């Protein structure tokens, strides 16, 4: 009898469990269907109102359109290609369009017009998209400058600005030259060896060393030896995909939080004693313009009655770690990729290369071995290289490293040149830099590399459209480090380009790997940008490097 009762109780418990599971599944399905209906009906309403968008399916939304486009692109092609690909497929969508890919993302309003992008970044600054914060959280804990809004953001942005000003960055050029010299020595060894190597990897290490100097006045020596902080930060970035990827499997990777915690511990173990020492001695550097010192000085001034640093508050220590990690990430990632693309563009356009080398001979003298010494003595000479600036800007036009994602507000509309008002409420609003920079409606000879467009006057057909160039975004929340990035790109190119010829080796690399080249291009471009934070050259840009022969430098 007792056994019978026990079996009955077990059967009852099992039935309750099955009922609970069934109920949870029913609730989950009902919730999913409700959200699906809400997303699709919202977009169908916009479609009925004449809002611009590709063909919309009542059940699948724009998922078939997006899937078809990405089916034609190579693996890991950057997500920001979608805007230009949609424009090519539907030429009438040449200013903005809505996309509905729920459950892979919220309803989106994609802008590829300078005028429309300026309306929500310059005329009014919409709040940052929550996905950006989710992406950065494992790295910074959501306490960084990018994640801030309102008064906190204004306060700290004002404190950071002097550290990234043009004059301050120019003063740091002599220190930056040291890291570029190390980089030059590494590239020279590859030139002598004649091997194929991924150019972006040593470039990333150099950029990390430079941003370490600018932020902390600290030598990471990432180019020469293993550094635990930079290694952990790069590894953490590889695992920071939540918020920017649409793959739902990214959300159920059980290893992710473990890796995040481990890398955070590695970074904090390196940073904490370094920051503690800088904080305790900050008053010994009253005129320091290093970014870390600026943050600490502002905090001491506001929180210490006698103006002297006391014990570092744990909350402020966490805040400091967040800013340093953010600046290290932002200061090396996209800049390194842009340097590589600048070399690539010059390789593909020998006339521009010859003109640039001639300008550098004029500004720094014909002795290429003296370039570094000249820059250390007269760093302001870099600003006299007008064609170098034009080359840099044109490269960033063709290969913008990021885009801008904001979130719409009730009652806020974007208005196109025809007077059409597009609602932003409940929408991810994107200024797609790649789509804007490659839009033939706004750029004559849009796919051509033409540094000259940055040197002509307003009456010339090539003169850039107002607000059209936005690799660092525009408006109050533009990239804080754009002056550093532009200076670093120009500095590296000025030192390297007269000594080395850098040629991509994709054909050899593909042959060696047995890859079918026809499946590895975007708009005919093999060095297409891939998703890894910002846009990076595919496969880290395999290349060969050779030394420039004397006859190559005999420029008429």
Swiss-Prot record:
Record's keyword terms, sorted: Heme, Iron, Membrane, Metal-binding, Monooxygenase, Oxidoreductase, Transmembrane, Transmembrane helix
Domain of life of the source: Eukaryota
Main location, first listed in the record: membrane
Catalysed reactions, semicolon-separated: motiol + 3 reduced [NADPH--hemoprotein reductase] + 3 O2 = 4beta-carboxyl motiol + 3 oxidized [NADPH--hemoprotein reductase] + 4 H2O + 4 H(+)
Gene Ontology molecular function: heme binding; iron ion binding; monooxygenase activity; oxidoreductase activity, acting on paired donors, with incorporation or reduction of molecular oxygen
Cofactors: heme
E.C. designation(s): 1.-.-.-
Gene3D superfamilies on file: Cytochrome P450
Functional pathway: Secondary metabolite biosynthesis; terpenoid biosynthesis
Practical uses of the protein: Polytolypin and biosynthesis intermediate compounds show antifungal activity and can efficiently inhibit the growth of the pathogenic funfus Candida albicans.
Location(s), subcellular: Membrane
Sequence similarity: Belongs to the cytochrome P450 family.
Protein purpose: Cytochrome P450 monooxygenase; part of the gene cluster that mediates the biosynthesis of antifungal fernane-type triterpenoid polytolypin.
PANTHER family tied to this protein: CYTOCHROME P450, P450, PUTATIVE (EUROFUNG)-RELATED
Record's protein name: Cytochrome P450 monooxygenase polC
Gene name of this polypeptide: polC
């Amino acid at each position: 009898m007792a056994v019978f009762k026990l079996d009955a109780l077990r059967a009852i418990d099992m039935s309750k469990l099955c009922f609970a599971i069934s109920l949870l599944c029913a609730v989950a399905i009902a919730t999913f269907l409700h959200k699906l209906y809400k997303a699709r009906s919202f977009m169908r309403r916009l479609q009925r109102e004449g809002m611009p968008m590709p063909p919309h399916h009542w059940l699948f939304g724009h998922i078939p359109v997006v899937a078809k486009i990405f089916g034609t692109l190579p693996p890991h092609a950057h997500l920001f290609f979608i805007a230009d690909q949609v424009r090519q497929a539907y030429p009438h969508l040449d200013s903005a369009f809505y996309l509905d890919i729920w459950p892979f993302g919220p309803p989106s309003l994609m802008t590829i017009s300078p005028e429309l992008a300026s309306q929500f970044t310059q005329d009014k600054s919409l709040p940052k998209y929550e996905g950006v914060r989710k992406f950065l959280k494992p790295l910074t804990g959501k306490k960084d400058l990018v994640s801030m809004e309102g008064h906190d953001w204004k306060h700290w942005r004002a404190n950071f600005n002097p550290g990234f000003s043009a004059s301050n960055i120019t003063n740091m050029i002599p220190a930056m030259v040291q890291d570029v010299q190390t980089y030059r020595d590494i590239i020279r060894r590859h030139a002598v060896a004649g091997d194929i190597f991924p150019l972006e990897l040593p470039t990333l290490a150099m950029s990390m060393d430079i941003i370490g100097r600018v932020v902390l006045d600290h030598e990471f020596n990432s180019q020469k030896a293993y550094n635990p902080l930079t290694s952990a930060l790069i590894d953490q970035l590889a695992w920071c995909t939540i918020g920017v990827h649409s793959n739902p499997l990214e959300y159920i990777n059980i290893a992710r939080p473990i890796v995040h915690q481990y890398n955070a511990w590695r970074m904090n173990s390196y940073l904490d004693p370094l920051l503690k020492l800088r904080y305790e001695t900050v008053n010994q550097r009253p005129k320091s313009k290093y970014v870390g010192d600026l943050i600490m000085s502002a905090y001491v001034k506001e929180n210490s009655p006698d103006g002297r640093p006391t014990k570092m508050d744990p909350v402020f220590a966490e805040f400091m770690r967040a800013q340093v990690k953010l600046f290290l990430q932002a200061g090396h990632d996209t800049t390194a990729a842009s340097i590589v693309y600048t070399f690539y563009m010059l390789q593909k356009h020998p006339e521009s290369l010859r003109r640039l080398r001639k300008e550098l001979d004029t500004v720094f003298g014909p002795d290429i071995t003296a370039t570094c010494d000249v820059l250390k003595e007269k760093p302001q000479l870099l600003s006299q290289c007008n064609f170098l600036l034009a080359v840099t800007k044109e490269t960033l036009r063709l290969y913008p490293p990021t885009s801008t994602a904001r979130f719409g507000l009730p009652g806020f509309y974007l208005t196109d040149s025809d007077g059409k008002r597009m609602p932003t409420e409940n929408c991810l609003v994107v200024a797609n830099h790649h789509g804007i920079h490659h839009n033939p409606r706004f750029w004559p000879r849009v796919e051509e590399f033409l540094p000259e467009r940055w040197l002509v006057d307003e009456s010339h057909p090539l003169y850039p459209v107002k607000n059209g160039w936005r690799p660092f975004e525009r408006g109050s929340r533009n990239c804080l480090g754009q002056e550093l990035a532009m200076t670093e790109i120009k500095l590296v190119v000025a030192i390297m380009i007269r000594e080395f010829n850098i040629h991509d080796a994709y054909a050899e690399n593909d042959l060696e790997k047995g890859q079918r080249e026809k499946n590895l291009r975007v708009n005919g471009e093999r060095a297409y940008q891939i998703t890894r934070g910002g846009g990076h050259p595919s496969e880290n840009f395999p290349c060969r490097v050779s030394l420039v022969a004397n006859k190559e430098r005999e420029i008429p």
